[in-house]
Amino acid sequence: MNRRRFLKSSMAVAAVCGTSGVASLFSQAAFAEDAGIADGQTRRFDYTVLQAMAHDLARQPWGGAPRDLPPTLANLTPQAYNSIQYDANHSLWNNIEERKLDIQFFHVGMGFRRRVRMFSLDAATQQAREIHFRPELFKYNDAGVDTRQLEGQSDLGFAGFRVFKAPELARRDIVAFLGASYFRAVDSTYQYGLSARGLAVDTFTDTPEEFPDFTSFWFETVKGDATVFTVYALLDSPSITGAYKFTIHCQDTQVIMDVENHLYARKDIKQLGIAPMTSMFSCGNNERRMCDTIHPQIHDSDRLSMWLGNGEWVCRPLNNPQKLQFNAFQDKNPRGFGLLQLDRDFSHYQDVMGWYNKRPSLWVEPRNQWGKGAVSLMEIPTTGETLDNIVCFWQPEKAVKAGDELDFRYRLYWSAQPPVSTPLARVLATRTGMGGFPEGWAPGEHYPDKWARRFAIDFVGGDLKAAAPRGIEPVITLSSGEAKQIEILYVEPFDGYRILFDWYPTSDSTDPVEMRLFLRCQGEAISETWLYQYFPPAPDKRNYVDDRIMK
């Protein structure tokens, strides 16, 4: 699977991409003093122009993979690439007094081979100027770049851009677009985590996955006191093109992005992913197979949360399975979904490098009717934390045919907590472990006669306390096996209730077991729905190992 080579750390490297369709629309002109670093000829631009460009581009053959970079850039190591810094004195809005926002660009090089074009846009006059690459925009430090190979290469473009906000102008970025159509943002912690993408194509099909590129960006010039800005993007790939409009709100505690896109299919597409996001889950409370480190948990996100079109709230803890898993949760006009990192307790991670307790959640809020489809979740086996292994997106039910035009509007919230949550009791944590014995009597001299797996699901909030005197009933549904030893315990430290049950196999099958649980009081649901996928061991592994040496 090419994805493994594509996803590095938590920011993707663009490896298989296409070229921009705007090469003939803008030409270089003499440097204009009033345009800051923009040195291109002025041309009219607005969102309707971009839509026409994407529409026309879809009716042309795809331009192919990126052209080769000069060897001094193509052969950079990650360490050398990271040492290249943009010169803050040449930032996009450096000439705006008392500005609250600013833009800097990423250098092409290493795996970032796509030559992305950047334009400065005066929204009042609808005039855009290109910003051409030139070495003096960067500080190469000890990267070992032979700048002689870069002379006269104004068409090198850039790899992407990042956004800074006062009072951390030029010091700590809060938004980054880099690699294919990947982008990220932070909350008040300034800690990056999971990524979003402009579009996903054939992520889980019998054809190779396609990674569309943002090939050009247009930045509306901001006013000095603005904390909101608009950037437009052209997306291109072998199968589809797109016109994107991002309105990005850089708030104190979160970043909110209003996204609007118009998509134009070049070819039939088996699987289209809208509002895709990419994260990492190595191990957690519920999955400790790969946790032989000093860190109790390692993950960018701990769950998929869904607010279905019918109003039901669903919590699906993430897994690091032994083999790739793909699940589609059918829905109609979803109200929202996201990959969340709700456990913010440092002691649960003990990580002073990754700071997983500070990583943001990402919530998608559709802003128009998305119709029938599914929230799709792919979980890929991983042995550590340096490869993103979680993918989530909305997949429309209707197949995409060549010539189709689609449009989607949605809002992305990058924040510690999602903007909405269920008024019912919600899942706090999920734990699994050895079963088959009474809670509080972990096996000592004798293991249980029958093998079982225990599940503990903690619920908090809602009307749990009011419902307790009237009786709380766990409603458990399993695709196979039996649930026994079901218990409900009040847990004072988190002021909630723990639901315990042991899963007993009723066959030798190792197929995933789909589990579903919610709480009910006098016939009425009082909690969100917990979904889980458990992978039972082979029959010969269903035993308890006693490795004590007593001699």
UniProtKB/Swiss-Prot annotation:
Q: List the signal peptide residues.
A: 1-32
Query: Which PROSITE patterns does the annotation name?
Result: TAT
Q: Which residues form a coiled coil?
A: none
- Note one Pfam family from the annotation: MdoG
| Keyword Heme assigned | no
Is this entry keyworded Signal?
A: yes
Identify the HAMAP family for this entry. Answer: MdoD_OpgD
Protein name, per record: Glucans biosynthesis protein D
Biological classification of the source: Bacteria, Pseudomonadati, Pseudomonadota, Gammaproteobacteria, Enterobacterales
